[in-house]
Amino acid sequence: MLTKAKLLRMSAKKYMAKKQLEFFTTQLTEQKSEALGEIEDARQRLRVPPECKDEADRASFEMESQLYLRIVDRKSKLVKKIDFALRRIKTGEYGYCMETGEPIGIERLLIRPTAEFCADIKYINDDKEKHFAE
C-alpha cells in the first residue's frame, strides 16, 4: 500500500500515475463515506426532536437544529466536490489545475484531495473574491 511518505518521495515523472490515482481514489472514497455518515447522523438528530417543556429547552433545540443543518449543508457540498474529484480521476484530469493545466502538487492534494486549482491560482481567485466582497 502506498503511504503518504512514499507518495511524497515519488519522482515527478510518476505524477498522477496509476498508484497515485489509486491512493487518492481511496482517500476520496473514505472521505465521502465519512461525510455521508455524518450527514445521516445529523439528519437522524433532526428527525427526532426532544420534548421541549420550556422556552430554554426549545431555544436549545433550535440552536442544535441550526448546527445540524449547517453540518448537512457543509458535508453535502463536500460530497459534491469529492464526486467531482472522482470524475476527474476517471477522465485523467485529476491533480492538474483547471485553469492552467499545471500540476496541483502532491503536497496540496494530500492536504485537500478535492483541490481543483494549483496554489497560485487559488490564491489569485481568493484575492479576487475578497476584493469583490469588500
Describe the residue ranges of each PLM region.
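Residues immediately within or flanking Cys/His clusters that coordinate Zn2+
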Residues: 76, 94, 115
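Short Cys/His-rich "knuckle" micro-motifs
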Residues: 107-111
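Interaction interfaces in information-processing and related assembly proteins
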Residues: 1-91, 131-134
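Short cysteine-rich clusters marking metal-coordination/redox-active sites
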Residues: 97-101, 118
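Amphipathic alpha-helical recognition patches that constitute DNA-binding helices
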Residues: 23, 99, 113
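Short, well-ordered alpha-helical segments in soluble proteins
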Residues: 122-125, 129
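Short functional micro-motifs and their immediate structural scaffolds
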Residues: 104-105, 126
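Cysteine-rich micro-motifs
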Residues: 115-122
